[in-house]
Amino acid sequence: MKRLTSLLLVLLLVVSCGKYKLPHSMDMLSSGCISDTRAGEDDFPALDPEDTAPELFLEYTPEGLAVTRKNAKLNCSIKNSGISCEATLSGNVLTYRAYETNGLQTNCLCLVQWMTSTVPGLQEDTEYTLEYTCGHEYLPIQFRYRKGMSLRFDLKMYEKY
């Protein structure tokens, strides 16, 4: 009886949390660090500022929501430890976070030209609110997930101040 009760509690926990309530780690591909600068400097001297504007692209794919970030400024620790990302879906709120895998910070910022991952499990033709974090926190972005969806966001407009 004790084993059955324990098994039922574990099953209840798994069902109640669901795969959407807990952070879901995803594979991420990226360009890696293409340029770096000292922390506190606003630009990358070797690059045209037009080429370093932060952008976010959301696209429908059969596998899930493709999230592509262009021109992310992350800590140079990614050169050794890489970038991780995770998503949590709670109701219609999708929280997406990309971050340096190793929490050790250096006095250096690295420009990542692009990084992309796919978030599975969204329902087609449904409105979602994306809470996106990558280096900065951004204001919520609303979108409808459906076939043919391809959205571009200038992230400077969405930065929280």
Placement of each model-derived feature along the sequence:
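Exposed, flexible binding/inhibitory loops of compact, secreted disulfide-stabilized domains
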Residues: 17-161
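Sec-dependent N-terminal signal peptides
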Residues: 4-14
